[in-house]
Amino acid sequence: MKKFFALVTALLFMMLSTAQAEIYPHCMPLEEMSVGGVGYGTSLGYVKKIYGEPVDKKIFTGDGVRVVTWIYSEYFSVTARTSAEDTTPEDNLQVVGYSLKTNALSTPAGLTVGMSYHKVVMLWGRGELVEDDGRRGYFYVPASSQLPVTLTFYVDANAKITEMQLGTDF
């Protein structure tokens, strides 16, 4: 009976592991979704300590949300979001996304704009294909969390990374 129970337990574990891999084949560690120290949940104040004041800001309040985007250049911006009623100072808002179009920053594993997407595939497997406004990209979700965040690697016709974009469903 003990052997039977052990066998059933092992089979269930294998089935669940396989199902998880089939549902989320495009995973990577959440820590690898950051660039230059900026990632999901980082405060805008921390971003400011690293990169200084942004050169421009875009603020949107409506539809129940307040969205603050700090623009450091045409190649790098960071976005935070909270509810429209939330009066938390900008510096304390948490990052929910960024856009990176330069190789000046990289992930902890060294991935950056300008590299071949195949380097990403070698580390984390092929991402889920997304086509957006005529652009082609591959997105990944955090491997060990239920956070609603994705990292998308947009590529050109030669599979060269042209942009890395962290974001949420909204």
Pin down the residues of each PLM region.
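Sec/Tat signal peptide C-region and signal peptidase I cleavage site
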Residues: 17-21
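Right-handed parallel beta-helix
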Residues: 94-98
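Positively charged n-region of N-terminal signal peptides that target proteins for export
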Residues: 1-4
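A cross-family detector of function-defining hotspots
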Residues: 24, 28, 34, 42-88, ...
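Bacterial N-terminal signal peptides
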Residues: 8-15
